[in-house]
Amino acid sequence: ANPNCTTMAAMPVLKPLHDAWGLTRLFASTYQAASGAGVAGTEELTEQVAAAAAGDISGLADDAAAVEFPAPKKWAVPLAFNVVPLNYVLGEDGYTDEELKLRDESRKILGLPDLKVSGTCVRVPVMTGHSLSIHAEFERPVSAAEAEAMLAKAPGVQVDLIPNPLEMTGKDNVSVGRVRKDSAMDNGLVLFVVGDNLRKGAALNAVQIAEALLDMAG
């Protein structure tokens, strides 16, 4: 099965780091594009942006009622000019199903059934491209320079000064940047990762899984 598109943006970055230094804890905040909710998601965002363009966009700076948005369907509140931190089904302990997928699939893909994972998944007014702010803790000390050097050689990964979803739309690689030591934990790193959720998160990953299965079949 094709894993969740947010998880798949993170794995090409986390896997080589784990192989080298041993991942023990993972904290992630995700910033997920409208296209993650399908065509209906991008259409709803487009309609909301059009309504704002026809109204008083600048008025939103001090009055939420300055624009009359169409009634939201995919999300509980308008996504345009906004962020939505609760747009999935709530599960155990207040985590959404998307946040639990991030935990469970990270454990499965990395082969770490007891990996400590905590995530917050947020929908943002971006058409395509999921982003993650990642705090990762490792068994062994690692510097930002060592991590960047490792990631620069990792397949499917590019190291950028400013990873952003607009520039990564339509590209197969995932982009990582803002790599630095985490001052709040031992042996920790902070990274920002971006991937096209319609390619690496979905179509491209499905092709790569099929190719791997064909190779296994001989």
Each PLM stretch: what is its role?
Residues 8-150:
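Active-site-lining helix/loop region of Rossmann-like oxidoreductase modules
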Residues 113-218:
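C-terminal active-site/capping subdomain that shapes the small-molecule cofactor and substrate pocket
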